[in-house]
A protein has these predicted regions:
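Exposed aromatic-hydrophobic patches
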Residues: 98-105, 162-166, 210-218
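Cysteine-clustered segments with highest specificity for TGF-beta superfamily mature ligands
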Residues: 113-115, 196-256
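Acidic, Ser/Thr/Pro-rich low-complexity intrinsically disordered segments
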Residues: 46-111, 115-123, 171-175, 180-195
Length: 256
C-alpha cells in the first residue's frame, strides 16, 4: 500500500519572513488513517534553538484549524500577512502518547506565517502540522451485555447487544473502519448481522472469519450500542465479544 503522507523538511535560510519556507496545509481524513496511506497528511520537520528562529508560510482556510506539535519543546507564533498576531503558544514534550494539538481560529482564508523558536540552547528537532486535525486509530473490545448465550438447533436466532456508549477511552468523534466478532464457534455459525443502533446502519459479517473491513465510508459512530443477530445451527453456549476498530481526529492528545 502506497503511503501518501508528505514530509517537508526545513530549508535554510528561513530565519526571516522574507525567507520563509512555503509549506502545505494539512488535509488529513479518517479514511487515510484507516487504510494506512495517510493521504493529505503534511508534516513539517525542522531544527531550532533559542538562537535559531524558523519561518514558514502556509495557506489556511477560514475557521477552526489545528496546530499539531510533536518532538522537542518549541514556541510557535501564527501571524497574518499584515503582522496581526493570530495565536502564540508553547509546545511542551510531556512524554505523553503522540502529538499535542492546539485549536487555531483563522479569521479569513489567506496566507499566514508561522514562527518556530526552540526552547533549548542547543539545536533540537521539532515536528508540526497545521490545518485539519491529524488522525489516529485505535480499537476496543467488549463482551455482550447478555453474558453467556445458549443456542439450539430448533431456535437458532438470538439478538445480543454490545454497549460502547459509556467507554471513556473512545473519542466521541471516532468512526468505525472495521468490526470483528470473537468467542464463537466458527463451524456452528450460519450468519451474523451487526447493527449500529445510533445511526441504524446494518452490516453482514463475512462468513467464517466473522469480520467486516473497509467501513470508513459508512461513517458509523464507534460510541454506540451495537446489536447482533446470531444464527446458529448447533446446540452450543458461548460469550461473544465485539471488537471495533476506529479512526478519530486528534483535537488535543492521542488516546493510548
Amino acid at each position: 500500500m502506497e503511503v501518501k503522507a508528505e514530509t517537508m523538511r526545513e530549508s535554510e535560510p528561513n530565519n526571516t519572513i522574507e525567507t520563509s519556507n512555503i509549506i502545505t496545509r494539512n488535509d488529513e481524513t479518517a479514511y487515510g488513517a484507516a487504510n494506512g496511506t495517510y493521504d493529505g497528511q503534511s508534516v513539517v520537520y525542522g531544527y531550532s534553538s533559542k538562537d535559531d528562529i524558523d519561518f514558514y508560510k502556509v495557506y489556511l482556510y477560514q475557521g477552526i484549524n489545528y496546530m499539531t506539535c510533536n518532538d522537542h519543546d518549541f514556541e510557535y507564533e501564527i501571524t497574518g500577512k499584515d503582522g496581526t498576531l493570530i495565536q502564540k503558544g508553547i509546545y511542551k514534550d510531556l512524554n505523553i502518547f503522540g502529538p499535542t494539538a492546539y485549536k487555531v481560529d483563522i479569521p479569513r482564508t489567506d496566507y499566514y506565517y508561522i514562527k518556530i523558536n526552540g526552547c533549548s540552547s542547543k539545536s533540537e528537532s521539532y515536528l508540526f502540522l497545521i490545518g485539519s486535525p491529524t488522525y489516529s486509530v485505535n480499537n476496543y473490545s467488549v463482551k455482550c451485555t447478555e453474558g453467556t448465550v445458549s443456542m439450539t438447533q430448533s431456535n437458532g436466532n438470538k439478538i445480543v447487544h454490545f454497549d460502547l456508549t459509556s467507554v471513556e477511552d473512545i473519542p466521541k468523534d471516532a468512526i468505525v473502519y472495521s468490526v470483528s466478532m470473537f468467542g464463537i464457534r466458527t463451524t456452528a455459525v450460519k450468519s451474523i448481522k451487526l447493527k449500529n443502533e445510533k445511526d441504524k446502519k446494518e452490516i453482514l459479517l463475512e462468513k467464517y472469519v466473522w469480520n467486516k473491513k473497509a467501513l470508513i465510508a459508512m461513517e458509523m459512530p464507534a460510541v454506540s450500542t451495537w446489536s447482533a443477530i446470531l444464527e446458529y445451527n448447533k446446540n452450543i453456549s458461548f460469550i461473544p465479544t465485539l471488537r471495533v476498530d476506529y479512526a478519530y481526529p486528534v483535537y488535543n492528545t492521542m488516546i493510548q
